[in-house]
Amino acid sequence: MYDKGQTLSILIDLGASFSYISPIIVELCKLVHEKFDKSWMVQLATCTKRKVTNYVKDYELLMNDFITHVDLNILPLGSYDMLIGMDWLEKHRLMPN
């Protein structure tokens, strides 16, 4: 996937309730983001917890020739730029059997 000349690596994670984007990508691509009224904690696969305070609303996502929109919580993701979670999969009825 590309965003303003950037190639992004995306993980589709069936264990994630929500979708996320790295703060590095938010900054590099100068994405408009908003602050939650109330922050919340996320437990990562490593059992560490991180606070989520900001999100990108209605991000246009292009995968191959498929264009869609996704709300992305901003969270450091390690080796991935974006994580697509169950919120997006359920919205688009893309549940695995």
Please report, for each region that a protein language model flagged, where it lies by residue.
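Aspartic protease core domain of the pepsin/retropepsin superfamily
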Residues: 7-9, 14-97
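A short acidic-Thr-Gly-centered motif at the start of a beta-strand
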Residues: 1-7
